[in-house]
Amino acid sequence: MLLASNVTAKEKDSAFVPFLFSTETLGLSVGVAGVAKGVWQPQAALFGMGLYSDKDSYIGFLSAYNYALTDRLLFSTQLYQAKLNQAPYYIGNQGNNGSSIEGKSIVDGFEENYKLEFKFLLPWGVIKDDGYMGMFKPQRDSSFASPIDSGVTSISLIPFYTSRKLSKAISSDETAKGIRLALDWDNRDSTRNPTKGSHTELTFSMGSESWANEEIWNQIELQNSQYFSLGSLGGIFEQQVLAFDFYTADTPSWNRCDESLTCVRPPEHEQVSLGGLYRLRSYTGGRYHGRSAIHYSAEYRMLPEWQPLGSIPVINYYDLPWWQWVAFVDVGRVAEEYDLKTLHTDMQWSVGGAVRLQVEGVVVRAEVAKGSEESLFRVMINQPF
């Protein structure tokens, strides 16, 4: 049994959670997050989050997921805006693999990130039998090693606009307008808590500041995740999973330079980077950036038999069917060339632990990670991979 109490909350169509926390970057922050499911369509969802800090910083995030435009075309969007006062940024050589944390710039930043996603589902695997609702099954068959027979295969077109403005004229304002093409095969048995299968995504990106008088920069990214069930462990763990993730990226246009040594490169906030919510998790977002990167993650995920959350007042108002303990390690590095020997030399690392739980159908993760430079605590939604 995952729930220790007979008094369980029924999963609701909407839920809102206030929060209060303090970090060195943001200061003392207060905010609220909310999710609404089945808005206009049963498989669709809205998610929003906003916070304000005593440093006069703010973050706003709004997203809409999985709205069916046709029987095989889904639409999603994400809108992000943040004003970060006296925040750390790693500009220019400050973001190289050999750079030091002491070289960071503490400045005021204004960030924007807006994107639309049009996802076309190929008539293979579960889509062939169940249509687009097949991708929302809580459990899926992942026993076949071919996208024709198993999983969800999709092609996504993702227009995006991003910008970053920093104070004190440390760097010029940077803007990127572009488009991504993503080829995705999701062959996991579950998207919220996978125990077996795999997930592979190949992404091509291209962009420019204006698309008028500038050359177009381009990037290639490949990510592959694998999951292996270890079964239960006596009366301690109901479920054990080993999860592995591999990521690599390159910017082919990086060394395409003119006579004035102006090169066709993305702005720094769009460069291949490590650090943040998904890779090298003990480092701030964009800590390392450059032309190329390679990164490996390994996680040991445990679902304990002991589940006290359903019997705790206030908390048991929310639907909490499971919680998960996680130990993880990340290693990776960026480089100014795509060379496997270079990318596997002097790699950066992170180790950490996390508690994850499903709240009203959304996976929430709280994790602490430590690296050679710093330690970070974060709370975010969704599994990292």
Where are the regions a protein language model picked out?
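C-terminal outer-membrane beta-barrel translocator/porin domains of Gram-negative envelope proteins
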Residues: 179-315
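Transmembrane beta-strands of outer-membrane beta-barrel proteins
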Residues: 16, 44-48, 73-79, 153-157, ...
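Transmembrane beta-strand segments of outer-membrane beta-barrel domains in Gram-negative
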Residues: 80, 86-243, 335
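Outer-membrane beta-barrel initiation region
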Residues: 5-78, 85-89, 104, 150-158, ...
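Outer-membrane beta-barrel translocator/channel fold
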Residues: 50-121, 235-277, 287, 342, ...
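Outer-membrane beta-barrel "beta-signal"
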Residues: 120, 181, 353-359, 374-385
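Outer-membrane beta-barrel pore domains and translocons
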Residues: 21-23, 51-53, 78-82, 121, ...
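Outer-membrane beta-barrel biogenesis signature
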Residues: 5-14, 128-149, 310-320
